[in-house]
Amino acid sequence: LTSDHFDDPADLARLPAVSRAMRDLVAETGLRFEELDENRAVILGCLSAVQRLQRGGLLSRQESLCEAAARSGQLEELQVLRADGCPWDAWTCAEAALGGHLEVLQWARANECPWDAWTCAYAARGGNLEVLQWARTNGCPWDAGTCKLAAHGGHLEMLQWARANGCPWDESTCEEAAREGHLDVLQWACTNGCPWDAGTCMLAAHGGHLDVLQWARANGCPWDKTTLSVARAMDHFEMVNWAMANGCPEQ
């Protein structure tokens, strides 16, 4: 085990949760690591880390146990947690949807786990169309967050399906496509009547996506002083020069 094995610090952070021996191996790499906090452990689906926090009396929400199990698709562990009386809430379904774990979501719903619009939004964020389709077929609500997070992830097919099936959208769809540099998503959204505002240009500037900004402006997207101020703050000098040369407001 060497430090060369860990490009992502999150991978290193997972290992101490495995065993005492693994903690010692991590220490031998000479790398420093931070213990996973509750939110990060859930995001990573690291149930063992959440359980360790629980044993140490450091868990702020007992529901985090079910969320972590759902996020990583650990159905048997989720079943054990529920049999032991562990509470859950709508975030369990949302985390299962984000991870693309349809079987976990189906079991949770069959056992009366609540859900809300975040289940659809998280399925969209994860690019899990089958999960989104099942959720909608079974009555899960959705809102503009589904289109927003589909755009954020660059999941054009997901966005197209959502719109074809009546999902609402708003300016946040264009904003998230611009933020992440998904020009094809922005183009499709704009062509199909999605509203936009100066936030689209500002977030293109934030991400340093000059091609997105140029296309947005060529197609009538408004901008204001935030485009320049954000581009400067992020040190996107080519974008600053282009925006100034093309009349972006500074006041």
Describe each PLM feature range.
Residues 1-251:
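Ankyrin repeat (ANK) tandem alpha-helical domains that serve as protein-protein interaction scaffolds
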